Amino acid sequence: MSLEEKKKTESKEKDKALSLVLGQIERNFGRGSIMRLGDASRMKVETISTGALTLDLALGGGYPKGRVVEVYGPESSGKTTLTLHAIAEVQKNGGVAAFVDAEHALDPVYAASLGVDVENLLVSQPDTGEMALEIVDQLIRSSAVDLVVVDSVAALTPRAEIEGEMGDHVIGSQARLMSQAMRKITGNIGKSGCTVIFLNQLRLKIGVTYGNPETTTGGNALKFYASVRLDIRRIQTLKRGTEEYGIRAKVKVAKNKVAPPFRIAEFDILFGKGISTTGCLLDLAEETNIIIRRGAWYSYEGENIGQGRDNTIIWLDQNLEIRNKVESMVKEKLTEGTEVSSNSMKALNSNPANTIAVNDIKTVA
């Protein structure tokens, strides 16, 4: 037998042994317990829209289904608003969403104004961190819930801390709780297809001279288990004269296992109304040269449609036929591969200020 024939025989034997062991594993542990990475049907990740077109682009489609997502940032930066929009999107598509309100601060009126069906929203206000995470785990295992939001990790107080006295040192109890919960949750989350979004607060590390002193609460487990981590910041207050009517938010995709990370998205959050979808559309239409800005004036197909960004947004909202036409043109250009700031890393590389400065952030308790 020649050397080439010997290699072919060995290769056939290996293929046969591999198919046998794969079949045995699937019989023992179920279909999908082991797979080839090139299996296209398994590689495709379904997503949930964030409610902001620019952020959907930065994430590669939206929040991935069957994954853990962490959203963190300073106070009043738009974390809860972001998740309420995700809940509204899930409900629009006939899905079921749950909100685990560990902070006991959910405003049903505000949620309804963002499009959330509060009548059918599952809400839990747990007494302890253990109770909250057990509820999350049971909702995931039911396979009947599409999205679970936990607001927030910082408010998941361990039972030992609640039952103890003020001033008692229970070092690392919350980190241990989160570590145990993540090990338990991630085993079930992929099978159920449920997305879990954890909101988190920022703290400052004591004595850090070099590097970023910011850190999130609850230890490091969530950082490792999360497929997507979003850093949301308030970069501007929107005003009409002296009246404040919203904020400009910047979201950096700090981690993404299902699409390229480190992309940046910006959008407006209007008080009482949530994310300005028309504002996102105008930004993208300007970047793709569908709407042209010259000075303060915006024009569409050679005709001026508004002086200033706010007036142009109002005009688009009043002329829905043209707005829908602009939206379809923007989506067509993006499908063709047109690069904009939300799906590019150029903005990040050219602007070191995107590692947003620390200001007005809660210090370590």
From Swiss-Prot:
Taxonomic superkingdom: Bacteria
CDD domains xrefs: RecA (cd00983)
One annotated GO molecular function: ATP hydrolysis activity
Keywords: ATP-binding, Cytoplasm, DNA damage, DNA recombination, DNA repair, DNA-binding, Nucleotide-binding, SOS response
SUPFAM superfamilies the UniProt entry points to: P-loop containing nucleoside triphosphate hydrolases, RecA protein, C-terminal domain
CC terms in the record's Gene Ontology section: cytosol
Coiled coil ranges: none
Gene Ontology BP annotations: DNA recombination; DNA repair; SOS response
Protein's recorded name: Protein RecA
Gene (UniProt): recA
